[in-house]
């Protein structure tokens, strides 16, 4: 029991020494820390950051609100330029033409004379969150450039005389860049050709009707004559073909019988066989020739016993 009490007292003393050492360390840390920065310096830094964020938010809101009244244009911004604008607050108020590239399919051909576009090549190029939106900082000061197509249309319309204001061809030329739908009539293609080309005068309807009736009657008579001639030729051809077939049927067996007959050569008496005896009549050779020719004519045997 005494040993346990002594050990407990030792542990208590060690805990007290540890607490005192921790308190001493706290006092040393407070004494070694540098004097705190003045509050006005911190307030200035915070105000600058807040002002920069407010300016960026205002620019984004203005771009989004004015996008409906301007054509779409893709603005490419780089991360390096954003860092420069964050470090230098004066760079935020610079015009958008110095920081971005504007792409417009209809007005890219005309170049500015008073201000040249500088193309910057950076490593990390990304499309900004308000891409395909154009700011109107420069649109209020100067007019929008015209493309070559608009200039050509103006030159074409200047030479033309004043015509009917309701003519859709003149509205097509004068309002070529307008995106309103153009409504055409049923005979729009004919009107277009009549206005743009010098067509000859059409003949009167009465003359056309008379000429068309006469030509139709002539064509009808010619077709009837051709059909009658064709029927007569076909009938004559059928008759001739039937006569030719009859003649050919009568001539075919004579042609088959007139083919050359292989006559067996004469051999000595001791080489003769019963199938090739020379004493047999010529009917035997005719019979063998008819069998080889394959004709369907009936075979008349004069001497059946001799063949056997």
UniProtKB/Swiss-Prot annotation:
Gene Ontology MF, one: protein kinase binding
Domain of life, per lineage: Eukaryota
Residue ranges of the region described as Disordered: 81-105
Listed name of the protein: PAK4-inhibitor inka1
Domain notes: Contains 2 Inka boxes (also named iBox or inca box). The Inka boxes bind and inhibit PAK4 by binding a substrate-like manner.
Lineage: Eukaryota, Metazoa, Chordata, Craniata, Vertebrata
Localization per record: Nucleus; Cytoplasm
GO annotation, biological process: cartilage condensation; cartilage development
Subunit composition and interactions: Interacts with pak4/pak5.
Keywords attached to this entry: Cytoplasm, Nucleus
């Amino acid at each position: 029991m005494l040993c346990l009490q002594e050990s407990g007292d030792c542990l208590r003393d060690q805990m007290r020494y540890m607490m005192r050492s921790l308190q001493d360390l706290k006092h040393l840390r407070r004494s070694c820390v540098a004097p705190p920065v003045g509050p006005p310096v911190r307030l200035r830094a915070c105000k600058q950051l807040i002002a920069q964020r407010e300016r960026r938010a205002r620019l984004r809101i203005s771009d989004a609100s004015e996008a409906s009244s301007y054509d779409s244009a893709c603005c490419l911004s780089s991360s390096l330029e954003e860092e420069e604008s964050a470090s230098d607050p004066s760079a935020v108020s610079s015009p958008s033409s110095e920081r971005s590239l504007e792409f417009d399919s209809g007005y890219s051909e005309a170049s500015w004379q008073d201000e040249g576009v500088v193309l910057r090549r950076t490593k990390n190029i990304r499309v900004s969150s308000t891409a395909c939106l154009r700011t109107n900082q420069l649109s209020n000061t100067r007019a929008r450039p015209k493309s070559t197509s608009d200039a050509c249309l103006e030159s074409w319309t200047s030479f033309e005389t004043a015509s009917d204001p309701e003519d859709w061809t003149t509205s097509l030329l004068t309002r070529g860049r307008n995106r309103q739908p153009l409504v055409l009539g049923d005979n729009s293609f004919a009107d277009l050709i009549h206005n743009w080309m010098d067509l000859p005068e059409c003949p009167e309807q009465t003359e056309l009707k008379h000429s068309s009736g006469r030509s139709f009657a002539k064509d009808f008579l010619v077709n009837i004559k051709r059909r009658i001639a064709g029927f007569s030729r076909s009938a004559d051809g059928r008759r001739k073909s039937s006569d030719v077939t009859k003649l050919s049927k009568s001539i075919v067996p004579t042609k088959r019988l007139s083919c050359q007959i292989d006559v067996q050569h004469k051999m000595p008496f001791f080489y003769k066989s019963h199938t090739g005896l020379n004493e047999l009549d010529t009917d035997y050779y005719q019979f063998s020739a008819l069998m080889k020719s394959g004709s369907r004519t009936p075979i008349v045997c004069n001497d059946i016993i001799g063949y056997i």
